[in-house]
Amino acid sequence: VYPYDKLASKVLGFTGGDNQGILGLEVFYDKYLKGKTGRIRTLTDGKGVEIDGAYEEREEPVSGNDLYTSLDVNLQNYAVQACRKVKKEKKAKQVSMILMNPQNGEIYAMVNEPEYNLNKPFSLSAQKRAKNSKKQQEYLNKKWRNSCLNDTYEPGSVFKIITATAGLELSKVQVNDHFNCPGFRIVEDRKIRCHKVGGHGSETFKEGVMNSCNPVFMDVGARVGVDGMYQTFRQLGLFEKTGIDLPGEASSIMHQKKNVGAVELATMSFGPVSYTHLRAHET
C-alpha cells in the first residue's frame, strides 16, 4: 500500500502481483527491496500428507531493505499544487517540475502532472478500457512516463547560459562588451530573428543576457566557434546522461560536430538542441 496515493508516483513506481518492481525506484532498487520468501522442505507420502518425524529443512524469510530518498513530502506537495495551477491556467496537457539542491544535485521534488494512483496503477477510464489491449498498454505507458527524464525537449533560451559560460570561460567576451541588435542577424543566406521585433539596439553583453537577445548570443557563439562550444558541452556533461538512479533516462540530441556550419552554430547558440528536463537542471 502506498500511503500518499499519487504523490511522486512517476518517481516511486510500483510493484506487480509477485511484489517485483515494475517502474521507478521500485524497479531500479528491486533486488535490495524485495527480500526473500521463507520456505519449509519436508517429506510427504503419496497423498501429500507430511510424514511424522521426517527431516525438515527451513529457510527463514529475509525482509527487504528500506530505501530513503532525498524527496521532501512538503516540497513535493507544494510543487504538485504549483504544477496544477499552471496546467489549469495554460490549459496544458502536462506540466513537470524539479526542485534540486544546486550544490549536490539532491532532488527534493520531481513532479509530472498529472500523476497516477500508485494503488491503482492499471486503472483506465471507461473510454480507454474499451480500446484493444495494445491501445490500452499505450495509454498506460504514457500515463506512467516520467517526462522529467524519459523525454527530451528544446530548452530554448535556457540554453543561452551555456553559450554565455563558453564565452566567458574561454575569454571570448567580457560583460561590458558592446553589441548591436537590429532585430536579426544574416548568417549565410538565412535571416535569423530576435524575439524582439525591431531589436534591442545598442547593448552590453550583460544587457544582452538580461534581454535574452538572440543576435548577441549568435555573435558570442561565432566568437567561441564550433570547437569551443563543443568543448564546453563536454565539460558540462551535455553528451552524457546524469546517471540518476531511475530507469529510462534519455540522452541529449544535438548536431554532430562535423555537421555544424555557420547557420547551425548561430541557432545552437540560443537553444535548438534537445535534452531532458533533468539534464537542464544538472547542467
Annotate the PLM regions.
Residues V95-I98, Y108:
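Generic short beta-strand
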Residues A54-V95:
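Conserved, well-ordered alpha-helix/loop/beta-strand core segments that scaffold catalytic motifs
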Residues V1-G64, T267:
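Small/polar-residue-rich segments within soluble enzyme cores
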